[in-house]
């Protein structure tokens, strides 16, 4: 029985071939979920990823042999059992009574967990004939996840299973505050891990009981807040379409849909493997760079070129100088309809009301100043004498002239005295060190520090007072 591991560590491949001849393959990455250090050494969120490990056992009796597998380089370390699969979904599982077992000796035909380290997953791998569902509690890999390279990830792989036993609950239920992760140049804030529990029935609905990660969906995957409902996730997963948060490059859509199908052309087995929730994480608003595609930039450029630039205010003021208000009034005044024949009653009221001729006032600020260009217009009220009004255009005063003294030298370009020490040293040391030179040298150095901007005058006075005392 040959062991098939695609583009993995050669030492791991050769060692597994000699130990138990088990065929191990890794399925494609099918989404993004919470990832943290299984050992909680530094209590730090290391990476986001999600995948499934698929073990094909040609010889079920090889499972107990995994207990003795130890590789000096640390590729496989402390394998332990985390769950067993449903016998109906696993042709190799023949004993349903071991569904709650926790030791390798009780599971001659069920899944095991390996802690794999320093693997190198560089390409998606196709599935094999018989799938024995299994999971991994800790996996440190140098992986190419969806075409991106991330070294030294610590990944929690919960597999596509229904029954979960002996997961490192004490480790996974640590309360972390303000976990953040920088992925694809975007910072994600995941809150803290509040609770982790197993669900043994697909009919049981997830229970959200606090911020951060809330619970496990029936197939053992972690749900993060602000994700689609589980039914919607499962429907998308069953169709092999997973939407996840990806890069935020200018030329790349941040939300990308990927279709995951076996490379050999076969269909996904109708098991829990097809019921994998995709977790779409919302990055922090403060760390979200604006996404601007090339099409958006072209549209903005075309839209900007369709407008005529607005003339500056000075052009408007100059235009108002030779503006003929009378001619403008004549051109803009609409023709008046003929007035109806007035009756004797209307004559008196018409004489009492002033006749106002509408005039167009330019859109400029008006003020009574004799020093500015002016234009005159006349307004007549009834039979009274015309009133001449003068319109002045108010101009803003010119800006004050900027100082043109070219002899001003910036502080950082001024030459320093030769006895001024560097600004990086502890300036109090030269005053307190008894092996220093005379007091005059210390004062010269102190003055140099003040001139260089290292000390302010108040600090200088305090130091001088200390020296005096």
UniProtKB/Swiss-Prot annotation:
Residues 248-314, 327-418 are annotated as: Disordered. Residues 366-377 have a biased composition (Low complexity). Residues 292-305, 350-365 have a biased composition (Polar residues). It comes from the Viruses. This is Uncharacterized protein VP7. It comes from Cryphonectria parasitica mycoreovirus 1 (strain 9B21). The lineage of its organism: Viruses, Riboviria, Orthornavirae, Duplornaviricota, Resentoviricetes. The gene is S7.
């Amino acid at each position: 029985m040959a062991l098939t591991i695609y583009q993995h560590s050669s030492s791991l491949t050769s060692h597994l071939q000699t130990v138990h001849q088990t065929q191990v393959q890794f399925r494609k990455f099918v989404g993004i979920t919470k990832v943290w250090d299984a050992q909680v050494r530094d209590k730090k969120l290391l990476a986001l990823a999600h995948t499934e490990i698929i073990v094909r056992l040609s010889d079920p009796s090889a499972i107990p042999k995994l207990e003795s597998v130890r590789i000096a380089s640390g590729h496989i370390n402390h394998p332990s059992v985390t769950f067993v699969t449903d016998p109906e979904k696993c042709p190799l599982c023949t004993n349903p009574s071991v569904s709650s077992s926790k030791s390798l000796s009780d599971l001659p035909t069920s899944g095991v967990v390996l802690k794999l380290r320093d693997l190198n997953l560089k390409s998606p791998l196709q599935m094999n004939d018989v799938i024995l569902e299994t999971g991994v509690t800790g996996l440190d890999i140098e992986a190419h996840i969806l075409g991106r390279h991330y070294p030294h990830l610590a990944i929690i792989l919960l597999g596509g299973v229904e029954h979960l036993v002996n997961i490192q609950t004490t480790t996974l239920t640590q309360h972390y505050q303000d976990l953040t992760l920088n992925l694809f140049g975007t910072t994600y804030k995941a809150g803290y891990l509040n609770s982790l529990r197993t669900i043994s029935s697909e009919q049981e609905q997830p229970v959200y009981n606090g911020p951060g990660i809330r619970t496990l969906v029936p197939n053992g995957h972690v749900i993060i807040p602000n994700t689609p409902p589980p039914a919607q996730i499962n429907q998308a997963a069953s169709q092999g379409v997973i939407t996840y948060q990806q890069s935020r490059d200018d030329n790349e859509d941040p939300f990308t849909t990927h279709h995951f199908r076996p490379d050999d052309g076969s269909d996904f087995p109708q098991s829990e493997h097809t019921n994998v929730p995709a977790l779409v994480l919302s990055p922090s608003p403060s760390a979200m760079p604006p996404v601007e595609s090339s099409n958006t930039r072209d549209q903005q450029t075309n839209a900007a070129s369709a407008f005529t630039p607005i003339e500056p205010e000075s052009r408007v003021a100059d235009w108002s100088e030779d503006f003929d208000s009378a001619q403008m009034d004549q051109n803009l005044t609409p023709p008046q309809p003929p007035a109806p024949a007035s009756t004797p009653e209307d004559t008196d009221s018409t004489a009492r009301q002033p006749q106002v001729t509408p005039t167009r006032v330019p859109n400029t600020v008006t003020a009574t100043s004799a020093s500015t260009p002016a234009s005159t217009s006349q307004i007549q009220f009834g039979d009274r004498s015309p009133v001449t009004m003068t319109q002045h255009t108010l101009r803003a005063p010119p800006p004050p002239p900027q100082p043109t003294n070219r002899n001003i030298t910036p502080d950082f370009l001024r030459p320093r005295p030769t006895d001024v020490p560097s600004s990086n040293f502890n300036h109090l040391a030269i005053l307190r060190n008894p092996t220093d030179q005379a007091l005059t040298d210390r004062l010269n150095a102190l003055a140099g520090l003040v001139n260089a901007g290292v000390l302010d005058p108040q600090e200088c006075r305090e130091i001088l007072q200390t020296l005096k005392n």
